[in-house]
Design a protein with these regions (language model features):
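Hydrophobic (often cysteine-bearing) scaffold residues that line and stabilize catalytic clefts
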Residues: 11, 31, 52, 56, ...
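C-terminal domain-tail junction helix/linker
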Residues: 76, 98-102, 123-210
Length: 210
């Protein structure tokens, strides 16, 4: 079940959704994002003037090109998880998904938490990016690019055992967590050693004073 069984590897399932921004003097712009469900890594994004099936396809093309899943032999192509918006239920997107040999899973109506990861990402991102006004689309794109870079490579996630999405996406998390465990064990051993020495040091000091 796509909703109750957690993914176990990168590129097993991608979550996608739109959110919106207002550019002063230009009107509304719509951000299409694709997030890897396992690592929370933002694989691709695109700032669009509409929320059409073609915009979804364009973002998917970027994600496929970035990951190379169409150029290597894989057990199965990533499944796409989305809501039931018009652009996601269109026959145009269905034909595209079939041509890419990808399965499309849509969330149950009135249960938006099935896309919880992408929705949380968009909320977090908008809390930062919307702190200022934008007067040109390229200004907004620039800030979005900065945020994605920070989110993927520098923002630690508690749900990922305090590593970054990039660490998980590129398979570095085991090495990082092992190194942390070694440092933790070494620190604890050093503390125990110092604690064992403390009473002896105090006793020697007392004798010297006498």
């Amino acid at each position: 079940n796509a909703f109750t069984n957690p993914t176990k590897q990168v590129n097993e399932m991608w979550q996608t959704d739109f959110t919106y921004f207002k550019v002063v003097g230009w009107g509304w712009y719509y951000l299409s994002s694709i997030l890897d469900d396992f690592s929370r890594f933002i694989i691709a994004w695109e700032l669009c003037t509409t929320m059409a099936a073609g915009d979804v396809q364009s973002t998917l093309n970027k994600a496929i090109a970035f990951t190379g899943v169409d150029r290597v032999k894989v057990k199965h192509r990533p499944r796409l998880l989305s809501d039931n918006g018009p652009c996601y239920v269109s026959s145009q997107l269905a034909e595209y998904m079939e041509s890419r040999e990808m399965k499309h899973v849509r969330g149950a109506p009135y249960h938006p938490m099935t896309q919880g990861k992408i929705e949380r990402y968009h909320r977090t991102m908008k809390n930062i990016v919307k702190l200022q006004h934008y007067y040109f689309p390229w200004e907004l794109e620039q800030e979005l690019s900065k945020f994605v870079e920070h989110y993927n490579h520098h923002r630690y996630h508690e749900s990922l055992k305090n590593v970054t999405p990039a660490d998980v996406f590129y398979g570095r998390q085991r090495k990082i967590l092992s190194a942390r465990d070694r440092i933790k064990r070494k620190t604890m051993e050093e503390r125990r050693r110092l604690n064992l020495r403390s009473p002896l040091i105090s006793k020697v000091d007392t004798i010297v004073q006498i």
